[in-house]
C-alpha cells in the first residue's frame, strides 16, 4: 500500500468535511445572489430607519481607545491561556516551571505598569486633563473669602 492511499484512508472524513463546507458556502452565496432583490436608484444607498426618515450622517467617529482596550484584552487573554497550561502541568514542571512562571508573571506585571505609566489605559485625553488642572488652579486662586 502506498503512502498516498494510506493518507487518503486516514483523512477521508476531513476531506469530505471540507468538500461539504465549501459546497454549502457556494450554495448559500449563489442562492442569495439568484433569489435576492436588486434595487436600483438613489434610494438604494439610504438606510432604512423603521419608516422614519434618517437625519444626519450615520458615520460616527469612534475613539481608538476601544481598539487599544481590545488589543490589550487579547494579549492578556493569551497570556492567561499560557498560565492555565502551566497550572495544569504544575506537577510535571516542578520548581523550574514555577520559577519560569514567576518570571513570566513579572514580565506581564512590568508590561502592565508600563501601560499605566504611558497612559495607554487612561480614557480621558491629555488635553482635558490639562484643562481640569488649570481650571482647578484658576478656581483656587480666584476665590475671595466673604
UniProtKB/Swiss-Prot annotation:
It catalyses: a quinone + NADH + 5 H(+)(in) = a quinol + NAD(+) + 4 H(+)(out). It is a multi-pass membrane protein. The chain crosses the membrane at residues 14-34, 68-88, 96-116. Keywords: Cell inner membrane, Cell membrane, Membrane, NAD, Quinone, Translocase, Transmembrane, Transmembrane helix, Transport, Ubiquinone. It is an enzyme of class 7 (translocase). It is found in: Cell inner membrane. The keyword Transmembrane helix applies. Its main location: membrane. It comes from the Bacteria. GO terms for molecular function: NADH dehydrogenase (ubiquinone) activity; NADH:ubiquinone reductase (non-electrogenic) activity; quinone binding. Its EC number is 7.1.1.-. GO terms for cellular component: NADH dehydrogenase complex; plasma membrane. InterPro entries: NAD(P)H_OxRDtase_bac/plastid, NADH_UbQ/plastoQ_OxRdtase_su3, NDAH_ubi_oxred_su3_sf. NDH-1 is composed of 13 different subunits. Subunits NuoA, H, J, K, L, M, N constitute the membrane sector of the complex. Belongs to the complex I subunit 3 family. NDH-1 shuttles electrons from NADH, via FMN and iron-sulfur (Fe-S) centers, to quinones in the respiratory chain. The immediate electron acceptor for the enzyme in this species is believed to be ubiquinone. Couples the redox reaction to proton translocation (for every two electrons transferred, four hydrogen ions are translocated across the cytoplasmic membrane), and thus conserves the redox energy in a proton gradient. PANTHER family: NADH-QUINONE OXIDOREDUCTASE SUBUNIT A, NADH-UBIQUINONE OXIDOREDUCTASE CHAIN 3. This is NADH-quinone oxidoreductase subunit A. The lineage of its organism: Bacteria, Pseudomonadati, Pseudomonadota, Gammaproteobacteria, Enterobacterales.
